[in-house]
Amino acid sequence: MQAHFASEFMLSLAHALESQLRAAIDRAFPEAAASARESGTGLDPQLAPASKPEFGDFQANAALPLAKPLKQPPRQIAAAIVDQLMVDTAFTAICLTPEIAGPGFINLTVRPECLAAEVQARLADARLGVPLVEGDNDGQQPTPVVVDFSSPNIAKEMHVGHLRSTIIGDSLARVLEFRGHPVLRLNHVGDWGTQFGMLITHLKQVAPEALETADAVDLGDLVVFYRQAKQRFDDDEAFQTTSREEVVKLQGGDPISLKAWSLLCDQSRREFQKIYDRLDVRLNERGESFYNAYLESVVEDLNVSGLLVSDDGAQCVFLEGVTGKDGKPLPVIVQKSDGGFNYATTDLAAMRYRFAAPPQGDGARRVIYVTDAGQANHFAGVFQVAQRAGWIPDAGRLQHVPFGLVQGEDGKKLKTRAGDTVRLRELLDEAVERAESDLRRRLQEEGRDEDESFIEQVATTVGLAAVKYADLSQNRITNYQFSFDRMLALQGNTAPYLLYAVVRIAGIARKGGDLDVTTAELQFSETQEWALVRELLKFDAVIAEVEEELLPNRLCTYLFELSQVFNRFYDQVPVLKAEQPSRSCRLALCRLTADTLKLGLSLLGIPTLERM
């Protein structure tokens, strides 16, 4: 299914101008156009957004590559194309008279009244010009998209690596949902595997009564519980033997082992949910154990399709085009020599299920995995196996969305002073505490008196927003350095800077500016007004880009640039003190800026404030 962006303003303008330019080139140079068509290329207008505001809105560079075949100077070619554009009424309805610049660039400026009309339309449109995705041609609903993210392990605490997966995945899911895709947000928790042998054995020995009575068990700090079990497993051979027997019992469906397993899972789930609630992240848990019933048939399927090879007793699929150091093809092991299954088997079962038509599966057509870049080779391997097994439909897309490490300011992996992994809960607590102390200091400096509920709300919103935004504003593929000072700064590409722009506009309303003002016709004359108009009208194209490229930092960069353009506008152009009709037109720009920032930030999972 193709995403359609026909109603998007700048994109649809670009499409219209491109076809008008092609037609103008055809009319100006029919022979050259015909021979280009015969060679199967056609003449490319080379239309692109203008590199600088003084060059207009778009630049067409078609005249330069035509100079050689036509044996004419490029400026002369550009002039002939412009002459043809000016007799096209559809073109003159959109653009002012083009300018020829430099060696033969054609600069195109959209008519001010077209831009103003689009601003007017967006003021009445809650979607701000972003269309809903269309379904398939036969009128069906858009097909589901699966976003697999967060995925912590049971009995282990969520750490800073889970933070990246959780907030990047949540933001991508929000953008896809906003576009109208049915999104299945899946939390593929690690709730199965050999580690449960030692955890259940430890639980049976330290809290045997829980297995008789409890619907829930409080094991205190699960991380400590895990460490104790691991320590005993490493030190005590008898414990090790019992743990291995426990794995077999669990896999065989022994009721007491299953009860112990579900108590462990429930306690972990409650801890995870506290984090998800704080971050305002929704997830449907579907752990590894869900796929247990499908593992044997995955191996069977691969065998039937002739992909399975027995290698030293293990069942493997050898990858095409991927070799090890010895030059031989690398295997994906789907069943170990002892008959056991592994991560790859579970991931393959999940892929098959997610693409399979309901009720045998989710019926997805796009499945997105948000994990650290260290898993890139693993996913490349299982993706290839799933493709070759025929489990991915023709229009299906499997995408791995990798991200880099979170580093300390020293450029090394983020650790506590004691050298431990940073717990997510503690990191979020510290962000809120620091935001609170910054706020109290600022209130004191400004001589402002605010009640405790205001301080708590602002500190919580700003602290959590700062953590989310610092992560999302980086290109996810790179490692990023975690710095509380940088992310909480009121200046620069930070959440507080963007939140403050929204607060500034709310302040205009409090000072008597009616942001819901309606004007018959918007008119702008100042350079800063037009700069803000043009920036506001890029929003829909940015959302299209994030949906396709799966890069939330593109949205962050746009919102930061919009805030900068707005602040320049507000500092240099009077709004509340302006005469009518300028006052109403400028208030309309303030309102659309606030709407765009609020919607953009909500797609990053960040709520806004009226006051800071």
Curated annotation (Swiss-Prot):
Which key words are in the record? Aminoacyl-tRNA synthetase, ATP-binding, Cytoplasm, Ligase, Nucleotide-binding, Protein biosynthesis
Q: Which reaction does it catalyse?
A: tRNA(Arg) + L-arginine + ATP = L-arginyl-tRNA(Arg) + AMP + diphosphate
Q: Where in the cell is it found?
A: Cytoplasm
EC numbers on record: 6.1.1.19
Is Nucleotide-binding tagged as a keyword? yes
Please list the coiled coil stretches: none
- Where is this protein primarily located? cytoplasm
Q: What molecular function does GO assign, one term?
A: ATP binding
- The sequence motif named 'HIGH' region is recorded at 152-162
Listed transmembrane segments: none
Q: Which domain of life is it from?
A: Bacteria
Gene Ontology cellular component terms for the protein in this record: cytoplasm
The record's section on InterPro entries has: aa-tRNA-synth_I_CS, Arg-tRNA-ligase, Arg-tRNA-synth_N, Arg-tRNA-synth_N_sf, ArgRS_core, DALR_anticod-bd, Rossmann-like_a/b/a_fold, tRNAsynth_Ia_anticodon-bd
Q: What Gene Ontology terms for biological process does this UniProt record contain?
A: arginyl-tRNA aminoacylation
Return the broad EC class. ligase
Give the record's subunit note.
Answer: Monomer.
Under the heading HAMAP family, the entry gives:
Arg_tRNA_synth
| Family per record | Belongs to the class-I aminoacyl-tRNA synthetase family.
Name of protein:
Arginine--tRNA ligase
Its lineage reads:
Bacteria, Bacillati, Cyanobacteriota, Cyanophyceae, Synechococcales
Gene of this entry: argS
